[in-house]
Amino acid sequence: MNYTTQMDAAKKGIVTKEMEIVAKKENMNVKDLMELVSKGKVAIPANKNHKSLDPEGIGQGLRTKINVNLGISKDCYNIDMELEKVQKAIDMKAEAIMDLSCFGKTEEFRKRLIDMSPAIIGTVPIYDAVGFYDKELKDITSEEFLKVAEKHAENGADFLTIHVGMNRKTAATFKKNPRRMNIVSRGGSLLYAWMELNNKENPFYEGFDKLLDICEKYDVTLSLGDACRPGCIEDSTDASQIEELIALGELTKRAWERNVQVIIEGPGHMTLDEIETNMKIEKKLCHGAPFYVLGPIVTDIAPGYDHITSAIGGAIAATHGADFLCYVTPAEHLRLPNLDDMKEGIIASKIAAHAADLAKGVKGARDWDNAMAKARRDLDWERMFELSIDEEKARRYREESKAKSKDSCTMCGKMCAVRNMNRVTEGKDLNMLRDDD
């Protein structure tokens, strides 16, 4: 192999097998895709050690992808349950899965996840550091943090989320500009705490070149985390968020110089009117790098329904430039999600992603909707079920409330507009009073 990373190959004009697969999925010319990868506008996260990977592209002109979060916590330490969630995410065709395990020895779960998953796998190494070393956070050294990142890369993680932009300058901006919710990023808060407790620079910022060595060695995509993402609508688009984003833009250029692919992580909580502006700011400051957003969650008052608040924000964000949506479940802000929560979150995120693809004019996006429109006009219920984003639910709802007429539903019965227009245009009687058809 005469290249180190997907970006290195693209710059050299080499079409990798991963590029070929992604181009076929996206129905685009592979040379056009290669050009986007070479410029950092598209990332293809593909660790050399992730042998079961079915690669996907994230970025400009491609379908909007979704990510599913899962992982072990201290209160819910159940590897088998988390592996069930992995299978659920795979079955529902999530393009990416992030292991957010944050307690104990996590390598066994991480390796099993990577071995079984065709989806892109992301991790957050700092979550693992305390358990990895059995040390208090403040006692972990800069070199030890980097060693944990290398272990995750060696295990086969396709992208690593690392909050490199939480440097001393960003921290100073945060201190000067108080927030209602402080720092709500788990990884960002851990790094900020470590920096304060040790009076030192962010180890990943200070050791960024070493981090790039790791990413280049394993072809790991660097997902630059947003430590200062807003945790409530009052904190959105503030000085801390923008200061960090400026730093991430500078770090992006350094990574690209080393042929390391980059994804930028983004907000967060914000009102509808701020979303488009935030997408444009990120694309400008971070040089068109793919944008990965959590939500955005557009109101803070809906615990139990944040899959909806997130889908609303995600659809708008992706319409205006976001490339990758992190799912949010009904359990957000309340507890670890279960399998039912996962399903709701995945479907909500997929709806948001697809709605945005329609708005952006992504090639082929309308084909699905056009097929559904034809099935509905034909009153082909079986085809409607097959095309439904949640086939099981669609079938169950119809089965639970059966119409007397086979070509209508219990909402309208024989007053169904589609049925009656079909019959009239075919020269047939409506037969409104009989139950035989």
Curated annotation (Swiss-Prot):
Q: Which family does it belong to?
A: Belongs to the ThiC family.
> Gene name on record?
thiC
Q: Where does [4Fe-4S] cluster bind?
A: 409, 412, 416
What PANTHER family does this protein's entry cite?
PHOSPHOMETHYLPYRIMIDINE SYNTHASE, CHLOROPLASTIC, THIAMINE BIOSYNTHESIS PROTEIN THIC
Q: Which Gene3D superfamilies match?
A: 6.10.250.620, Radical SAM ThiC family, central domain
Q: Which GO terms describe its cellular component?
A: cytosol
Organism, by scientific name, is Clostridium botulinum (strain Hall / ATCC 3502 / NCTC 13319 / Type A)
The cofactors required by this protein are: [4Fe-4S] cluster
Which sites bind Zn(2+)?
269, 333
Protein's UniProt name: Phosphomethylpyrimidine synthase
Write out the transmembrane intervals: none
> What role is this protein assigned?
Catalyzes the synthesis of the hydroxymethylpyrimidine phosphate (HMP-P) moiety of thiamine from aminoimidazole ribotide (AIR) in a radical S-adenosyl-L-methionine (SAM)-dependent reaction.
Source superkingdom: Bacteria
Record-linked HAMAP family: ThiC (MF_00089)
Pathways involved: Cofactor biosynthesis; thiamine diphosphate biosynthesis
Query: Catalyzes what?
Result: 5-amino-1-(5-phospho-beta-D-ribosyl)imidazole + S-adenosyl-L-methionine = 4-amino-2-methyl-5-(phosphooxymethyl)pyrimidine + CO + 5'-deoxyadenosine + formate + L-methionine + 3 H(+)
Q: Which GO terms describe its biological process?
A: thiamine biosynthetic process; thiamine diphosphate biosynthetic process
Question: According to the record, how does the cofactor bind?
Answer: Binds 1 [4Fe-4S] cluster per subunit. The cluster is coordinated with 3 cysteines and an exchangeable S-adenosyl-L-methionine.
As recorded in UniProt, its EC number(s) are: 4.1.99.17
